[in-house]
C-alpha cells in the first residue's frame, strides 16, 4: 500500500479506527489472475462490523494474501486500509511469534511455546507497520481501538507517532497467570507496549489483575490494588504523567440478530431436514470449532468413545456432528492435531457405527452462516469443551438460537463464557469422568429442567450483547481523560508472591 495514495484517498479523516490483524474481508485470488473481496470468517469481524458501520469508521488490517499491494478501499460502506505482509512476514510474525509463541503461552502451555529472536524482530517490525498505517488513517483526536495479541506493541508505537489520539486495546484471548507470562523473553517490551494505551481491556477480571501485577513487577509502575469488576471498578497504572485504565469487558454476539434468524421458517425447515439426513436420531450432539488444540475436540471424542463403550449412550439413537473449520494448516502442531482427531473419529465409527449410520459426522471445512444456525436449531446438546478459551462465542450463539428453550449446553469451566453462562452443564475438560457425566446428564435431561436452564441462559445472552460490550468499552475509553481519585497507591514495590497466583 502506498502511504501517499492512501493519504490522498481516505486516510487521515477517520474519527474512529479499528486496528486488527485481519480486515473484515479477505482478498481472494481467482484462477484467471484477478482478485475479489469476500467476507472473512471470525468472531472479531462479527463483533465489530456492525459497530463500524454505525460509527462510519475505518479498519486497518491485512487482506489475507501475502505480497499483495492493495490501495485503501470502500467495501460495503466500510473504509478499509490494507497492510502489506510478505510471505516471510506471515511465516515469522503470524505463524511464528503470534501463533507458535504467544498463542500457546497465553493458553496455559497446552503446547510448548517456541522462542526465536528472528520471530520477535519481525513481530516488532510488523507492529510498527500497523502503527504507521493507523497514524496515517486517524483524524486529529481520533479514537483508535486496537485488537488482540498479534498487535500488542502497537499502542506504545502509535502513542509516540500520534500523541493526540485516544487509544484502546482489547485482548480477545486469555491473559496468562503471572508465572507463565514471566517465561517470555520479551515480557517487559510487551507490557510496555500495552501501557501505551489509555485503556487495556480483557474478558475477565482475572486477566486484568494479572496485568496489574506485571505492570508493577516488570516496569515498576504504581498501580491500584483494589479488585477489578466486570465493566466496573477499573484498575489503574501510573505511567509517567499518564494514567492507564485496566478493565474487564466480556465480549458477546449480536444475539437479537441470531435469535431472529433462528426463528426464520427456512432455517427451521433446514433444521428438520438435517435431523432427517442424520436418520432422525433421538439426540444430536454438536461441536463447532476452529480446528485448534485449545478447543478440546479430542476431549469430547474420548468422552463419547467411553460412553459408548460403557453403554451409557445408545449408539443406535445418538450422533455427534463435529464441524471443524480449517486453521493454521502449515503449523506443525496443527497438522499433528488434525491427524489425531481424524484418527479418533475413524476409531469411533469403526467400533460403534453401522453401514449408513456413523456415530460421528465430521466436516473439515467452513460452514455457511445460515447452515450453521440450522445446525444450532437442530442440535439437542451443544458440546463446548476447550482446555482454555478467552470467551467462546459459539456457546452464546447456540443459546441465542434456542428460542424454543430446547437443547442443552455442555461448557468448559475454562472458557470466559462460563463466568456468565452458569446454567450450562459446566465441566472440567481435564476430568474425563466429569465430562462423561455431564454429557450423559445433558443427553438425558428432563425437558422442564432443560427449559429452566435455557431460559436463564437466554436471559443472560440476550441482555448482554455485542453492542453492550462495545458501548461499555468505548464509554470507559472516552472517560479516560476525566480526572478523579485514581486509587493508585504511593508505592512502586513489587507485588507480593501471592499475587502471582491470580487467575
Swiss-Prot record:
Chain residues that bind D-glucose 6-phosphate: 22, 94, 148, 328
pH dependence: Optimum pH is 7.
Regulation of its function: Stimulated by the polynucleotide FII (physiological activator), and by chondroitin sulfate (CS) and heparin. Activation by the polyanion is inhibited by high salt concentration as well as by high concentrations of mononucleoside phosphates.
Region of interest (Disordered), ranges: 481-503
Reported temperature dependence: About 60% of the activity is lost in the absence of FII after 10 minutes at 40 degrees Celsius, but only 35% in the presence of FII.
Complex and partners: Homotetramer.
Protein name: Trehalose-6-phosphate synthase
Origin organism lineage: Bacteria, Bacillati, Actinomycetota, Actinomycetes, Mycobacteriales
Gene: otsA
